[in-house]
Amino acid sequence: MERPQLDSMSQDLSEALKEATKEVHIRAENSEFMRNFQKGQVSREGFKLVMASLYHIYTALEEEIERNKQNPVYAPLYFPEELHRRAALEQDMAFWYGPHWQEAIPYTPATQHYVKRLHEVGGTHPELLVAHAYTRYLGDLSGGQVLKKIAQKAMALPSSGEGLAFFTFPSIDNPTKFKQLYRARMNTLEMTPEVKHRVTEEAKTAFLLNIELFEELQALLTEEHKDQSPSQTEFLRQRPASLVQDTTSAETPRGKSQISTSSSQTPLLRWVLTLSFLLATVAVGIYAM
């Protein structure tokens, strides 16, 4: 087992986490697909898939936070009104998938792996929960508003914010000040050098779980590419933008647990755009933490 470094152990927890995750953070953000998102190339189908994964992830995270809200290893970071995203994501699921969204949203293998780890941490290693909360919530606060504006413009969504509740934190007036408060609370957590080391390692794991989501979509993209004949690929390249960014009328069948790779419903370009948005969600957000 890797022994904790003395210099990192003398740091505040917030600084130790930022330092420890630099390398894996670079892995998450250095992708050619980031350029697609920065250009506003976000499809509705791709966005729906990302939001469904986030719903499952935050549901698991917040179930474990509730379980450990009075545990001193997490209690100082309990900000349900300000931070919790499940209720907002339920609104978004209803917008994107309709009234029967609970039966319609996909639940991919990589998402299931992420959820499993969150439950393991909350159930048997609650002192590590801070790593996942830090990675997700501070990233959302840092990059969420930028991502919201890009997605809103790219998909011509209502200015009132329907479908984008996840990115809105109505109980936080000043994100910068709140992040300062959150870091200060993190630094009050009492932990041994060994526990601090495990927390920083778990933060790396959180990044790797997000990267696994990216790789899952990349695999789907590769499979989709192999299934495309030259004529089909050329047709996709020539499709007007209005057809690429279609409406949400083609819903996922109820009870479906895996993403369909049918070329008629999820063309090659959509997987590219989906992957770019996933990368941006983590990389742009956490970059500014």
Curated annotation (Swiss-Prot):
Source taxon at top rank: Eukaryota
GO annotation, biological process: angiogenesis; cellular response to arsenic-containing substance; cellular response to cadmium ion; cellular response to cisplatin; cellular response to heat; cellular response to nutrient; epithelial cell apoptotic process; erythrocyte homeostasis
Biased composition (Polar residues): 244-261
Subcellular location: Endoplasmic reticulum membrane
Ranges per topology, Cytoplasmic: 1-266
Entry keywords, A to Z: Apoptosis, Endoplasmic reticulum, Heme, Iron, Membrane, Metal-binding, Oxidoreductase, Phosphoprotein, Transmembrane, Transmembrane helix
Subunit details: Homodimer and higher order homooligomer. Oligomerization is crucial for its stability and function in the endoplasmic reticulum. Interacts with FLVCR2; this interaction is potentiated in the presence of heme.
Protein name: Heme oxygenase 1
A Pfam family reported for this protein in Swiss-Prot or TrEMBL: Heme_oxygenase
UniProt domain comment: The transmembrane domain is necessary for its oligomerization.
Keyword Iron among record annotations: yes
Membrane topology value: Single-pass type IV membrane protein
GO cellular component, one term: caveola
PROSITE patterns, per the entry: HEME_OXYGENASE
Phosphoserine modification, residue list: 229, 242
Chain spans, region Disordered: 225-261
EC number: 1.14.14.18
Main localization category: endoplasmic reticulum
Record note on modification: A soluble form arises by proteolytic removal of the membrane anchor.
Transmembrane domains' residue ranges: 267-289
Organism this protein belongs to: Rattus norvegicus
Enzyme class, spelled out: oxidoreductase
